[in-house]
């Protein structure tokens, strides 16, 4: 059944029907479409816009359709134009002429926006829940590796000694921001558009606030033209997902590097690795590589929607139907990526001794030698030059800083004493950095406490979302 006709004298071409159809992808919103329709028709009855007995009969029919679809007894007809027309035609088949009153006072324009917002509200809660699961994994990893020394890098060159906990907690901060962004995005999603009609509301005395309350929205939208033209909520969601995927991708890149034979910082579990069809020795980090690759896909989904919307006049245009495939793909890709990534890092093995050995080379404690001289009264810029010359000497002699004798140290400055050896011990280098945000155990404990509190507070916020 088509939801339009009358003024047409010819049948629409079959190719146009296929081109125009959205049932193949918007059918996933059948629950939201039915729930929205139940709220709408309940309001129609209570406001005496249609007879109350008709309202109850329609609502009962919609519940029956919902139950049968959930149970798999009723199958969605893919020849329908969209999920809205399928639900309405099925309703009329079930209950008769009263079903034709369902669409009183609304348009597909405000209906589809309602469905999408309801769907997104539910999906965002699922996404936040999965990011919190990932944060719990990072919390455990960091708690177990407060003293696991590793080299920190800049420009992919060894820079200063840090701990694995410090490194892991850097990513936890990124994911905290992702959760905060999604919660903020949810606030703007929480505006109910139904009642906006095609563009100029309706002449029926509908009660939009009542529908909003029934559906768990905090308020109604204030301008009907904007309500049916708006896809900011979809674009903003995809923007949040793009940032989230970027963070997963950066983490994946490091997982890939760390798992190489050249690094061996970690070993991925067999259950999250794959092999080669020709090289029997291979153990490939395909999960991390796919997360890295799928990030570009989510970026593409965002660019699709931005491009669709960039030149559209008010109000609704059929171009806007192109929002859903990109939106749904971005949602599904991100959710699967988070869940799989979490499993990968939860099961990976940390090679602590190799990390520490790596941190012991590459002069990662050079900055601490300069800081030592500063504490002895040398200006930092002079100390920097002294240590630069010292490093050049070490390179020429094939020595590490730790292996220099005191007399060799004194060749560069008479400020060096026996206490230099304690100052350049890697654990000392780390523990001296007690500044908020640093790698010392005391600082890491604070970061872990903050992460634990954030997880608890976010769960509480999640439970309050309608």
From Swiss-Prot:
It catalyses: 2-(N(omega)-L-arginino)succinate = fumarate + L-arginine. Its EC number is 4.3.2.1. Its main location: cytoplasm. Pathway: Amino-acid biosynthesis; L-arginine biosynthesis; L-arginine from L-ornithine and carbamoyl phosphate: step 3/3. The keyword Ribonucleoprotein does not apply. The keyword Disulfide bond does not apply. Keywords: Amino-acid biosynthesis, Arginine biosynthesis, Cytoplasm, Lyase. GO terms for biological process: arginine biosynthetic process via ornithine; L-arginine biosynthetic process. GO terms for cellular component: cytosol. It comes from the Bacteria. Pfam families: ASL_C2, Lyase_1. It is found in: Cytoplasm. Signal peptide: none annotated. GO terms for molecular function: argininosuccinate lyase activity. NCBIfam families: argH. Belongs to the lyase 1 family. Argininosuccinate lyase subfamily. This is Argininosuccinate lyase.
